[in-house]
Regions:
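Per-blade loop-tip surfaces of WD-repeat and WD-like beta-propellers in eukaryotic adaptors/scaffolds
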Residues: 11-32, 57-73, 104-119, 182-192, ...
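Canonical WD40 repeat/beta-propeller blade segments in eukaryotic WD-repeat proteins
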Residues: 1, 31-45, 79-87, 141-164, ...
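Blade-level signature of beta-propeller repeat domains, shared across WD40, Kelch, NHL, RCC1
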Residues: 102-108, 206-259
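Surface-exposed loop and turn segments in beta-propeller and other repeat-based domains
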Residues: 12, 20-24, 30-37, 57, ...
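Loop/turn-rich, solvent-exposed surfaces of beta-rich toroidal or solenoidal domains
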Residues: 97-99, 142-186
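Conserved beta-strand element within WD40/beta-propeller blades
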Residues: 6-11, 45, 52-56, 94-98, ...
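Loop/turn residues immediately N-terminal
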Residues: 13-16, 50, 58-62, 92, ...
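Non-catalytic interaction/regulatory modules that flank or connect domains
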Residues: 166-205, 212-221
């Protein structure tokens, strides 16, 4: 979506930038950060300004303002392995995906000499590192979903809605035949069960919001890709969890889009 010609790469213990326009191995030597120890990096994401968040299978997260230097902030292991990572365009919010829950982290500093700065720009104080919000499903919903899907909970990498000058308002992920969206405002207000679901007959392979909107969701199933309106997601109840969406092509559920 931008004119950027390079992309970020990572291995178990290194972060680097690849520029396809270069000759040879395409590696930008000045933007290589290699660690002696095996950090087991697993996912990365960038902000609009190019700040970089990197997560690992150990569960920790590093925040950089650019490649080739030490991280500005290191957030210690938060639990399970982090399999997916996303950041808001302005860098305020970091979203990590673990197998059975999500982690939402506020990267803006609230106290000390660097108040108002992001953890990408300045290090957090020793005793003021951000505390992540753990986003999980209600245990009763999980129990029924696992029975219906005949498989344990396993989230796909969660994403914010994105767009040019768009404000992040929603989060989407999936597990088995279920898509789940979280409402960011409801999360921050502490509302119980701030998510809605959509059930399919088949496993959801991938999902994301349509670019520039949080009202439409693109869903990839084993044999087709469709776009559905977010308004068709339902509050999690015994009925909405047990009843799959039967016809993807009904006019009530498909967004009329010329693209």
């Amino acid at each position: 979506m931008t004119g950027e010609q390079t992309f970020l790469g990572l291995s178990n213990n290194a972060l680097f930038r690849i520029d396809p326009r270069l000759s040879g191995n395409k590696l930008v030597e000045s933007q290589l950060k290699q660690y002696v120890s095996k950090n087991d990096f697993s996912a990365a994401a960038t902000t609009e300004k190019g700040y970089i968040a990197v997560a690992s299978n150990k569960g920790d997260i590093r925040l950089f303002d650019r490649l080739g230097i030490n991280a500005k902030t290191h957030i210690p292991a938060l639990g399970e392995a982090i399999m997916g990572l996303d950041v808001s365009a302005d860098g305020k919010w970091i979203l990590g995906t673990c197998k059975t829950y999500l982690l939402l982290i506020d990267a803006e500093q609230k106290e000390g000499k660097n108040v108002g700065k992001l953890g990408f720009e300045k290090s957090f104080g020793k005793d003021s590192k951000p505390r992540p919000r753990r986003l999980g499903l209600n245990p009763s919903h999980v129990a029924q979903m696992q029975v219906e899907a005949k498989s344990p909970l396993s989230f796909t990498p969660a994403k914010f809605n994105t767009g040019l000058d768009a404000q992040e308002t929603s989060i989407i992920t999936s597990t088995g035949p279920f898509m789940i969206t979280w409402n960011l405002k409801k999360i921050l207000r502490g509302i119980q069960n701030p998510y809605t679901i959509k059930r399919y007959n088949e496993e959801v392979k991938a999902d994301n919001f349509r670019f520039g909107s949080d009202k439409s969701v693109i869903v990839a199933l084993p044999n087709e890709v469709n776009m559905v309106a977010k308004q068709t997601f339902k509050k999690p109840t015994r009925e909405s969890i047990s009843t799959p969406m039967r016809n993807l092509k009904s006019r009530s559920s498909i967004v009329d889009s010329r693209y």
